Amino acid sequence: MTSVSPRYRNVPVPKVFLSFRGEEIRHGFISHLADALERYGIMFIIDKDEQRGNDLTSLLLRIKESKVALVIFSSRFAESRFCMDEIVKMKECVDERKLLVIPIFYKVRARDVSGRTGDFGKKFWALAQKSRGCQIKEWMEALECISNKMGLSLGDGRSEADFIKEIVKEVERVLATFTSEDTEDHHCQTVKLLKGLVVGCLAHQELPLVLVFTQVYYYVKFSIFFIEEIFSSCFRKGFVLKPCKEDLQINSISIPGIDLENFKNMMQQAMYELNQMLLQSLGNIDPHRDVAFENQPQDQPDSPIALPEERRVALEATKFCGHAAYWWNQTKTTRARIGKVLIHFWEKLKKKFKDTYDRTVRI
């Protein structure tokens, strides 16, 4: 079981994996470190239970989900077979350049960890006597690899509070590098996706509306009001207003510049963020309840903000896309049936705003 700190940014935030051993530091140093990471909005993964089992598949998954690992070497670290297996997996990820490890030497010397000497070495060799030769070799290589990296040490007489501040500062510095890289990658994907969606929406009038809204999501990052122009354009030109064919296969649609497998994974997050941004831009609207604009007294100071008709359609359409994204990701039906679900939501939207729909289509 792991505890993951909450999300704080739109761009996916790299997680920090904490590896340690010992009840004596769990309720002291580790708990204070975890509190500090959470205060600074740093996502982290930490095992709640001291008895962690031997599920290496789960172990590898937790490490692979992280971009940074803090290995807290203490005198008892090497007595744990599970901890030693953790750093072996970390070394594999480091070799593949998928993980950055920061060794933290908590009241142990770095050379004792690397050379398996001192109190740390005694624990290691005691464990080695109960283990296989190939396993011992992997542990030794992992210890040397990780302990020789640039790390932080807590020596005698140093304040743990100051030491924790130094650790958090270093983690923030490292994460800033990853976040910058992720933002650049995200921007490149955005440009590629936009080009493909513009061409695809023009070429395939029977595409589900969700494709258009993904396009809107990226435009809305630059200007929230651009969404009105997109809606007006879609209504006037009749894009994606026609029902899909019964045998529509989303998989068969060719959209230049789009990998549909990656697209469906990106869509749910895109729709959620679009919905949140739109709700915030439109005023005092509670996203957790349906918004009823009909017969709303507009002269009351406590009533929701009065919205133009197109914005009402925009708001409802984002709800539609949220439903569509959910079904796309959650159902196990074929993509042809998913297309029918999207059209079902679109038909409900048309009926709710029939006057607006009829007027804009005639333009």
UniProtKB/Swiss-Prot annotation:
InterPro entries per record: TIR_dom, Toll_tir_struct_dom_sf
Enzyme Commission number(s) from the entry: 3.2.2.6, 3.2.2.-
SMART domains referenced in this protein's UniProt entry, alphabetically: TIR (SM00255)
Main localization, broad class: cytoplasm
TIR domain mapped to chain residues: 12-175
Gene giving rise to this polypeptide: RBA1
One GO MF term attached to the UniProt entry: NADP+ nucleosidase activity
Swiss-Prot/TrEMBL catalytic activity: NAD(+) + H2O = ADP-D-ribose + nicotinamide + H(+); NADP(+) + H2O = ADP-D-ribose 2'-phosphate + nicotinamide + H(+)
Name of the protein described by the UniProt record: Disease resistance protein RBA1
Signal sequence range: none
Induction annotation: Accumulates during immune responses activated by a variety of NLR proteins.
Active site (catalytic residues): E86
Sites where the protein binds NAD(+): R21, G22, E23, E24, I25, R26, G53
Mutation effect (H32A): Abolished ability to induced cell death
Subcellular location: Cytoplasm; Nucleus, Nucleoplasm
